[in-house]
Amino acid sequence: MEARCDFCGTEKALIYCKSDSAKLCLNCDVNVHSANPLSQRHTRSLLCEKCSLQPTAVHCMNENVSLCQGCQWTASNCTGLGHRLQSLNPYSDCPSPSDFGKIWSSTLEPSVTSLVSPFSDTLLQELDDWNGSSTSVVTQTQNLKDYSSFFPMESNLPKVIEEECSGLDLCEGINLDDAPLNFNASNDIIGCSSLDNTKCYEYEDSFKEENNIGLPSLLLPTLSGNVVPNMSLSMSNLTGESNATDYQDCGISPGFLIGDSPWESNVEVSFNPKLRDEAKKRYKQKKSKRMFGKQIRYASRKARADTRKRVKGRFVKSGETFEYDPSLVM
């Protein structure tokens, strides 16, 4: 009895899909596996002509029959008879009727490949168009990188400041090998006079007003008291090298410059003598209410232990003579 297609139930099943464990005709194979790119990856093969349950592994050229691995050894024993066998490899994707005929030209009859409906090529073309549209989305996303300079999220302010301040010769005449380092004076660490960086700050303010870019307060902290204006001067600039990370560190965070320390308010609370006395009183009250060591759990054992004789603190066994002379112990 011929196996029928599991999808339509009317046509003869010729294809076996291992992923779906389904027997399909040629038309249903195209319709099912052209739905999305995931179904195109399913590996399919011809259906065994003997058992109609497993995919074919070989094609016997002498008997012109396609067999699975089990039917090859049990039903026909083509290997033992010395028949010419052709190995059949599974296929994927959705080949057109012309391509399908080329794949199984030596296996299927020409009348079988003609059973495929003519609209199968149209479905494959629509699927290719769908795949092409997905690549266009990626192309549009990559084109956004060309317009990144128009977004206000990123600014070229550090580079402009570097170009403006590069001609000031801030580090001219500085020899770090011989210069004494003084970390106590924040204004004069390298043992020379304070560097003039007012031009950089003036240009930074003018650049901010012209371009109307709202810089966060972290880049320009409020200067109060004896706080020194921070400079983006790194050791790499002294040697002639440049690095993008040199301009990310703008100095001390404003959280350490403005306001009181968060831990100063808790100092008085932890050393308050009144709270300490109240805690000691609560501890003594709980200690006086403890029952550990005062409760007799086994009254009968205690009564017997009080009457038993002891030698050096240990009980004397029953039946033994009790001879104890304290003078001998001394």
Curated annotation (Swiss-Prot):
Give start-end positions of each zinc finger (B box-type): 5-47, 48-88
Q: What is this protein called?
A: Putative zinc finger protein CONSTANS-LIKE 11
In terms of InterPro entries, this protein maps to: CCT_domain (IPR010402), CONSTANS-like_Bbox1 (IPR049808), Znf_B-box (IPR000315)
Q: Which family, according to UniProt?
A: Belongs to the CONSTANS family.
- A single Pfam family, by name? zf-B_box
Which residues does the UniProt record annotate as the domain CCT? 276-318
**Organism's domain of life?**
Eukaryota
Question: Per its UniProt record, what PANTHER family does this chain match?
Answer: CCT MOTIF FAMILY PROTEIN-RELATED, ZINC FINGER PROTEIN CONSTANS-LIKE 10
A GO cellular component annotation in the UniProt record: nucleus
SMART domains annotated for this entry?
BBOX
**GO molecular-function term, one example from the UniProt record:** DNA-binding transcription factor activity
Q: Where in the cell is it found?
A: Nucleus
- Which key words are in the record? Metal-binding, Nucleus, Repeat, Zinc, Zinc-finger
Binding annotation for Zn(2+): C5, C8, C28, H33
